[in-house]
């Protein structure tokens, strides 16, 4: 492809709307343009990168035995009501009513649709297992779409769904997809980690997220340097030390604490450690107010708390008015003693007594509180977020914390949807059984953005060769010189014939403009041909990842180039 005939409108300045580096560079490199909030048009360069990702995803899905289909984007409400997710999914589900007053939604995911398909087609165990996938545009009505392709309302996703006759088969399907995902991200040239994760609104018995490692990632990954343990911070288990004998605790005592609203203020006022204070946090779940207790120096893990409550709607902090109605006190003075609502405590709190808690009265706290004696706690369970210094739940080594971007998620769904939608088959004994399901998602468009978040520099994008719209940029510095143009055309034809996607910059522009655009667009390989190089019989090279420059001879160019290119790809961990 010749850049003089290509639509690649690069920008010198970063649009004010762009916050994260991938959004900035995708706009500046002429890969996407915003239509409206969270919805983008893919320009030729962006679409080529998207298609390159989809190609590898499709190849590995096919290799794993999954079969490609294409399901409708519009889904009837009846299916979602049958599964129970119509009310549970929340406002991210874009709902509408057609001219016949039929309720529908734009699909953010397709568990209901694919289960409905299979339940009408599969009758016997002989038809199982089956694994169906699609690559399709999805829609989620994000409340605050931002970060370009990272968190848009419309996005391209690969979603696969497996159906098995028994648990062992479902496990085999799950781990088969897990391995396929690992191959995909390796082939894409990305640094990634698979971690245990919460199943969220999709549901299921267990799941893993595939995270692209990036300092700008929204997710925190907890990993053990000594074993294979890894988890999203939402899922990571917080380990308690062994319980010991507790000394007797004096009777609870109410004291005045005027103006001490936070645990830090209170601890300083009382001259006690923050860790001796209990935070009482009031939440509303499914219309009911509940309390969660964690140590003053800990943070509540809201995902763990929501899962404990099996909350159908989003968990939210109680408003100041709701706190006062439940406790009789303003925010900052709530406590578990005498509280007439369900109280749940982090299990760490059972290991000690003599706590400081709110007195459920303005400007007052209680000293010497023993939760077992003074409060009515429904249960003690793991409710806190893991923190630096916490041990690995598998081997006891101290955990490491890194940032990542979720680009893939695999779920073992079990019977969640097959039971709800009555997807059954007849087993070997002629007995009706529910199919056991798994689902597996990859954010195809998100991978493009994540690759940039992981791989960029001051000059622009640094794409891995398997994602880059063009693996090579051939820059002709002398577009008015017939000899230079003829040699550039010759090299371009040889590269193209060898299956190497190449962008020939034949524009009548200054060299500096061409070099800056090549860096900005992220071509992994840069080849430069100019009058001086022609005179010397060489082509200049640049490895975009390392910035290393070199030369290749025009005589026997392609053989020398093939060896050099292999080294560039090896640097990305590619064959």
Curated annotation (Swiss-Prot):
Its main location: cytoplasm. Transmembrane segments: none annotated. Keywords: Aminoacyl-tRNA synthetase, ATP-binding, Cytoplasm, Ligase, Nucleotide-binding, Protein biosynthesis. One of its GO terms (cellular component) is cytosol. The keyword Ribonucleoprotein does not apply. It comes from the Bacteria. It is an enzyme of class 6 (ligase). Pfam families: HGTP_anticodon (PF03129), tRNA-synt_2b (PF00587), tRNA_edit (PF04073). Its EC number is 6.1.1.15. InterPro entries: aa-tRNA-synt_IIb, aa-tRNA-synth_II, aa-tRNA-synth_II/BPL/LPL, Anticodon-bd, Anticodon-bd_dom_sf, Pro-tRNA-ligase_IIa, Pro-tRNA-synth_IIa_bac-type, Pro-tRNA-Synthase_IIa_type1. One of its GO terms (biological process) is prolyl-tRNA aminoacylation. It is found in: Cytoplasm. GO terms for molecular function: aminoacyl-tRNA deacylase activity; ATP binding; proline-tRNA ligase activity. It catalyses: tRNA(Pro) + L-proline + ATP = L-prolyl-tRNA(Pro) + AMP + diphosphate. Belongs to the class-II aminoacyl-tRNA synthetase family. ProS type 1 subfamily. Consists of three domains: the N-terminal catalytic domain, the editing domain and the C-terminal anticodon-binding domain. PANTHER family: MITOCHONDRIAL RIBOSOME PROTEIN L39/PROLYL-TRNA LIGASE FAMILY MEMBER, PROLINE--TRNA LIGASE. NCBIfam families: PRK09194.1, proS_fam_II. Catalyzes the attachment of proline to tRNA(Pro) in a two-step reaction: proline is first activated by ATP to form Pro-AMP and then transferred to the acceptor end of tRNA(Pro). As ProRS can inadvertently accommodate and process non-cognate amino acids such as alanine and cysteine, to avoid such errors it has two additional distinct editing activities against alanine. One activity is designated as 'pretransfer' editing and involves the tRNA(Pro)-independent hydrolysis of activated Ala-AMP. Homodimer. This is Proline--tRNA ligase.
């Amino acid at each position: 492809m010749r850049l003089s005939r290509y639509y690649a409108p690069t920008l010198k300045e970063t649009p004010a709307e762009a916050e994260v580096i991938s959004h900035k560079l995708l706009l500046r490199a002429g890969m996407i343009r915003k239509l409206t909030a969270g919805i983008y048009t893919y320009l030729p360069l962006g679409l080529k990168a998207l298609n390159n990702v989809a190609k590898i995803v499709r190849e590995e899905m096919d290799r794993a035995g999954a079969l490609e289909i294409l399901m409708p984007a519009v889904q009837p409400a009846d299916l979602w009501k049958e599964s129970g997710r119509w009310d549970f999914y929340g406002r991210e589900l874009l709902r509408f009513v057609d001219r016949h007053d039929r309720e529908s939604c734009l699909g953010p995911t397709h568990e209901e649709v694919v289960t409905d398909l299979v339940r009408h087609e599969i009758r016997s165990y002989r038809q199982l297992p089956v694994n169906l996938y699609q690559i399709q545009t999805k829609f989620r009505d994000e409340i605050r779409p931002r970060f370009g392709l990272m968190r848009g309302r419309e996005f391209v996703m690969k979603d696969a769904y497996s159906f098995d006759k028994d648990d062992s088969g479902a496990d085999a399907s799950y781990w088969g997809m897990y391995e396929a995902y690992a191959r995909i991200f390796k082939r894409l040239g990305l640094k990634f980690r698979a971690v245990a994760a919460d199943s969220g609104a999709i549901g299921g018995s267990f799941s893993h997220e595939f995270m692209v490692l990036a300092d700008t990632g929204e997710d925190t990954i907890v990993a053990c340097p000594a074993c294979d343990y890894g988890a999203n911070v939402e899922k990571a288990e917080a380990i308690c030390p062994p319980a010991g004998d507790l000394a007797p605790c004096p009777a609870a005592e109410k004291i005045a604490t005027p103006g001490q609203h936070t645990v830090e203020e209170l601890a300083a006022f009382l001259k006690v450690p923050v860790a001796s204070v209990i935070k009482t946090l009031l939440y509303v779940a499914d219309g009911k107010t509940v309390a969660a207790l964690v140590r003053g120096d800990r943070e509540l893990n809201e995902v763990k708390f929501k899962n404990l409550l099996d909350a159908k709607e989003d968990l939210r902090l109680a408003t100041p008015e709701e706190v006062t109605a439940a406790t009789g006190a303003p925010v900052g003075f709530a406590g578990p003693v005498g509280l007439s609502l369900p109280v749940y405590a982090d299990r760490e709190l059972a290991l000690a007594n003599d706590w400081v808690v709110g007195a459920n009265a303005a400007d007052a706290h209680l000293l010497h509180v023993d939760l077992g004696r003074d409060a009515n706690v429904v249960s003690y369970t793991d409710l806190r977020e893991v923190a630096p210094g916490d041990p690995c739940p598998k081997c006891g080594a101290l955990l490491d914390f890194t940032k990542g971007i979720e680009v893939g998620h695999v779920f073992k769904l079990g019977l969640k949807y097959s039971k709800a939608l009555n997807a059954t088959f007849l087993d070997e004994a002629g007995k009706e059984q529910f199919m056991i399901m798994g689902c597996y998602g990859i954010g195809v468009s998100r991978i493009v953005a994540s690759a940039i978040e992981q791989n960029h520099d001051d000059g622009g994008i640094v794409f891995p060769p398997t994602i880059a719209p063009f693996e090579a940029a051939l820059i002709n510095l002398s577009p008015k010189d017939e000899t230079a143009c003829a040699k550039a055309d010759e090299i371009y034809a040889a590269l193209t014939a060898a299956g190497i996607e190449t962008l020939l910059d034949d524009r009548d522009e200054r060299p500096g403009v061409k070099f800056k655009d090549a860096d900005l667009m992220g071509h992994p390989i840069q080849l430069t041909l100019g009058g001086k190089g022609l005179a010397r019989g060489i082509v200049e090279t640049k490895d975009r990842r390392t910035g290393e420059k070199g030369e290749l001879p025009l005589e026997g160019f392609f053989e020398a180039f093939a060896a050099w290119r292999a080294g560039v790809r090896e640097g990305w961990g590619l064959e």
